[in-house]
Amino acid sequence: MIENKIHVAYGFHVNCYHSYRGDTNDNLGFGSDIRIIRKILDTLTEFNENGIPVKGTWDTENFFSLQKILPEYAPDIIEKMKERVEKYGDENIIMGYNNGALSAMTEDEFCESINLAITNPDGSGLNDIFGTCEKIVRPQEVMFTPSQVSLYNKLGIKALCLYYSCVPFDAFRTIIPRLSDEEAFNPVTYTYNGESMTIIPTYSNSDVCDAGCLRAWVKDLRKKQESGEINNDLFLFINMDADAIFWETIDLGKFTGKVANTDGIHGLVTEIADLPYIVFDTPGGYIKNHKPIGKIEFTHDTADGNFTGYASWSEKPFNRKIWTRIERARAMSKVTSKRDMLSPSFNNRVLLLSTTHFGLATPVLNIQREKTALELSDKVIADEITVMPKAKKITIHNITGSLLQCVQVEIKEKIADISCIKIEAKDLESFVAIPTADDNSSAYLMFKFKKNKKKYDIKINFDGECKKTTFKNLLETPRMSMMFSSNGNIAFVYCDGRKIGGYDFLQSYLTYGKKKFEFNNTGITPLSVGGNGEGVRITGEIHLPKEIKSGSYTFDFFKTDFSDAIFVRTTVDYPYTAETTSISTENSALGRYSDMNWKETVPFQITPTLDGDISVIKRNFMDDISSFRTQSFPECDEKNQKIDSFNHQLTGGFVGLYDENGGIIIANARQVLSSMAHCPMRLEKDKTVRMNPYGTYYGNQRHHFSRAKDEVLEAYTLVAAQGKSIAPSYNGSSETAVFGLYPMAKSGLSDIEKQEICAFADGALITTPENEIIAPFTDDNITLKDANADGIDEKDLKNPVLTGISGNLGKYITKGFKGIAHIITTQIKAK
C-alpha cells in the first residue's frame, strides 16, 4: 500500500575486547574501534545538523568497553553517545554485560549478564550511563537457545535481534521455511514449548551488498508495497560490528564515495535520504507501534560462527581447556554455595564466559587473549578451591541427586595396575575404575550406591589383588554389544537388538592439505579395569607429511555391571608440523604462527546406521533437552542436501542421533573435557549423519538463499577471517576425554535413563585429606603446543581482503568480479 513506509535502522555492535586482536590502543588492539566509532558518531551528527533525522542504535558491551576501555582511552565517545540519545533519539539496546555466550550459560549466569547490562554497582549499565535503554537484546554472536525464551520473558525483554542473513554470519535463515518479505522485514513471533517472544530479523552489510546497494533494496521492497504484495510497513535493521571497515569510507582514489557500499555509514544514509517513504528509526521505536507479522519455530541452538553455528567458540582445543575449567567451577559451586550466584567464582566466571575468550578468531585466538583467558580461568578455579570443605575422610559430594557418582582423581603414588584398587563405602553397590593416563597417574572412578545421599564417605587403597585380564573382543551390556576385529576396528554395534553400526561406525583421521591420513591401529589388548568392569584397549599412531613429531592415541572401551552404556576413555596426542603462516591483518592480528595445511581433525567419528528422518537430541546448560530434524536443512533450502559441518547442538552433557526406531547418545564427562558445543556433525546427501566429538570438520559453507544469485555469498566465504579451518589449532596438542555411548529406545529416554546420563555427564565432587593416596584431579586434560609469537608490528598489518585472496586468486577473480559487477549494475539501475 502506498501509505505504508519503510523504516530503516542502523545498528552498531560495540565490543572493544577482541579475540582476534590484543589490548593496545592501536590497530593491533582496539585502536580501529575507537577510530571508526568516532567517525560514525560525527557522521550521524553531521546528518542531523543538516536536517536528516537519522538515528543510531547501539548495543554496547558493558564491562570491558563501557567500564574499562572507553573511559580510559576515549571518554569522548561515551559523551557523544549520551548527547545523541538526548538530542537526536539514538537508542541503546542490550548486548550483555560481558559480551557473553548467553545461550551456554546457567540460569543465574544468564540473568546476571542481562541485569548487570542494564544497571550495576560500577555504574557501567546502560541505564547508569545513558539514563535509559530499550529492553531489546542483540545477543553477542546471536547466541540463542530455545529454552531461554522463558528467562527473557521473566526479565521483561521485549524482543531479540537475530541475523536472518544471506551469508554464514547468520542465526536462523537456513533452519526455517523461507519468510516472505513482509515477514522478513517485520518482527515475528517465536514460540518454544508454548512460550513466545518477539524476534526482529536483522541484517548485516553483506545483505546490503547482496541487494546491490541499500537504495536498490528499499526500492525493490517499495514496489511490493505499491503493488499490494506487501500491505504493511517494513523494518530494515542493518546491524554490524562497530569496528567493521564497512562503516567507514574506503579510499578508492578518484572513485572514492562513488561506488555503493564503499562510503561507509555516510553512503548508507545518503543513498536513501531523499526517498519520501523512508523513516529513519530504531528497533524500539518500530516495535512500539508495530506488532509481529509472522510466526516461526525452530529448536536448533543458534550462533553466527563458522558454518553458521558454534564452531568458532567450541571446536578449538583451547576452547575446551577454558570451558572445562568453567564446568569444574560450576560443579564446585554446588558444594560451596547454596545458590550459584552466591558462589565465590560466580563474578569472575561471568566475565570468563565472554565469547572473546573462545572466538570468533580462527584458527586460534590472539596470543594476548589466550593469556588473559588462562589467567581468569585459573582464578575461577582458585576461588572455589579456597572455600571447598576440608575433608577428614575421602568424601564424594553428590551434586546430581543420583545413585551414580563419577569423579576423576589424581593417584599420588606409583601403581602398576589399576585393577588392584580397593574401595569400601557404606551402601556401595558397585564401582569401576579405569586409568585416564597411560602411566596410571590419574583415574576415572564410577560408583553405584544403593541409597541417595548428599555425600558418601569412602576408603580407597591399592592393596587388592590385581585381576588377571583375558582378552575378549566383544563388550556386551543388557542393551548394547560392540565387537572388535583383530586389528582393533569396530566390526559391529547393536543397540536393543538392532544393528546401528558396522566397520564405518568409528573412523579416525586427519585431513592435511588435500589428503586424508587415517589413524593407524597398532595394538588391541585387554584393558585393566578396577572393580566390576572389563574392557578393550586400542592403541595406534598418527602420521603427517614432514611431521616434526609423530602422534599417537589410546582408546579404552569399557563396561560396568550397573549401566547399559559402553564407556570410552580417549587420549589423542596429535602430531606436530612446522608453523610458518602468520595471520596478521587490520581485522585479525593473532600474533602467532600456524600451519594452515591442517584442514580437519576427526579423532573419534561416530556414524550410526539410522534410517530416513534422523534427528539430533541435545541438552543445553539450563538442563533443557530438545531435538531438531536434520532434514530441516534441505527442507528449508534444497541446496543444503549435504552440509559439510553443522553445529547447532549445545553439549551440556550429552548429544545424540535417533530415528523412529531409536538411536545412540554420546554423554561426555563435563569435568574431564568439555566445550559449549563439542560435537560438530556432517550431513551427507544420502541422509547419513556423522558425529565428530572433540574434532572439527571443514568444507563448503551451507547455502543461504539470496537476492544476488549467490555472488556475495561466494565472495564472502573467500575473505571472511572466521571462514578458515579450525584444525591448525590442534597441531601438537593432546587431549583426554571420557564419554559414554548410551542406547536410545524407540520410545525415547525414560526419566531414569535421563537421570543416569546426566549424572554421568555432570559428575560428582571428591574431597580428600592431604595424606591420602588419591586427590581431586585439578590438572587440565589437555596440553597445547606453546604459541610461537610472530612479532608483527602494526605497520606490517595486511589488508584483510588481500589476505583472503591469498591462495584463492583464481576463485576471487571470478567470484569477486561477479559480486562487484552486481553491486555497480544495481547501483546504476537504482538511481
PLM segments and residue spans:
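Catalytic alpha-helical scaffold of carbohydrate-active enzymes acting on polysaccharides/glycoconjugates
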Residues: 2-135, 142-199, 215-232, 266, ...
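Conserved, mostly hydrophobic/aromatic
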Residues: 95, 137, 238, 349
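Aromatic/acidic polysaccharide-binding cleft in carbohydrate-active enzymes
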Residues: 243-254, 287-306, 346-368, 678-717, ...
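Beta-strand/loop-rich accessory regions of lumenal/periplasmic or secreted enzymes
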Residues: 473-756, 763-764, 801-804, 809
